[in-house]
Amino acid sequence: MERYENLFAQLNDRREGAFVPFVTLGDPGIEQSLKIIDTLIDAGADALELGVPFSDPLADGPTIQNANLRAFAAGVTPAQCFEMLALIREKHPTIPIGLLMYANLVFNNGIDAFYARCEQVGVDSVLVADVPVEESAPFRQAALRHNIAPIFICPPNADDDLLRQVASYGRGYTYLLSRSGVTGAENRGALPLHHLIEKLKEYHAAPALQGFGISSPEQVSAAVRAGAAGAISGSAIVNIIEKNHASPEQMLAELRSFVSAMKAASRA
C-alpha cells in the first residue's frame, strides 16, 4: 500500500497526475505480455492495473473480453499470472501494481490464501469488480491483513452513503467511474466529475483515479483539471494489442507512443 502513498506524494510535489494503463496478464502470451508491461513502464506509466484472465468478465466490454480469450488461447493460468507478477515486481521494485479481479478467482483457493499470495509476489492493491461495497467485508478484511489495499469503485451516480463507505473502506486509490456500463474506449467518459471528486476529498477517500472510456490525452488532462489524482486507461491500450499482436515490434512501438502521450497529458 505504501507504494501508492509514495507515488501520489511524488506526483503531488511535481504537480502531475498519475497515468495508469490496464492490460490483461498473459495477453497475447506470457513472453509478449511481460514485454508489453516493461514497455508501458518505460513509456511513463506511474502504476499498473492488471487483469487475470477470467471466463465471464461482467464489467468488461468486447475489447477486454477478447484479451481474456487470447490469454486463454495461450494457455495462461492464474498460477502463471502470479509467477508473472513476481517477475514484474522483481524488475520494477517501486511501481504500484493493482489487480482487477472477479470474485470467483478470489474464492477459488480461499479468500485469505488469495491475498496472502498477492502479498508474497508484491501486489499492492486488489479491486474485485463484482463485489459491491456492502458485501466486501471478507475481502477487505483479508486484504488489510496482508497489507493489500482494497480498491472500491465510485460510480457517477453514487449517493452520499456510498461515497462515505468508499472513503471509509478504500485504501490506495479510489476507482472513479466516468460513466455507468461496461469498459470500452468507444464509450467516451463524460468528463469531468468535480462534485464527486470534491466529496471524496471531503470524506478523506484515497486519491481518485478516473477510469472507463479514457482513450485520449485530452481526457487525461481534463480528469486532472477536475481534481482527480490521475486516470486509468484499459480498452484503448488493449485495442493496440488486439490490432498489432501479430507484429510485436509494431505493437510495442504503438504502445510506447500512446502511453508517452497519455502521461504527458497528466502534466498539463
Curated annotation (Swiss-Prot):
Transmembrane portions of the chain: none
EC category: lyase
Pathway membership, UniProt: Amino-acid biosynthesis; L-tryptophan biosynthesis; L-tryptophan from chorismate: step 5/5
This protein's GO CC annotations: cytosol
Pfam families per the UniProt record, alphabetical: Trp_syntA
SUPFAM superfamilies: Ribulose-phoshate binding barrel (SSF51366)
GO molecular function, one term: tryptophan synthase activity
Active site per UniProt: E49, D60
NCBIfam families, alphabetized: trpA (TIGR00262)
Role according to the record: The alpha subunit is responsible for the aldol cleavage of indoleglycerol phosphate to indole and glyceraldehyde 3-phosphate.
Family: Belongs to the TrpA family.
Protein name: Tryptophan synthase alpha chain
Species the sequence originates in: Salmonella schwarzengrund (strain CVM19633)
Taxonomic path: Bacteria, Pseudomonadati, Pseudomonadota, Gammaproteobacteria, Enterobacterales
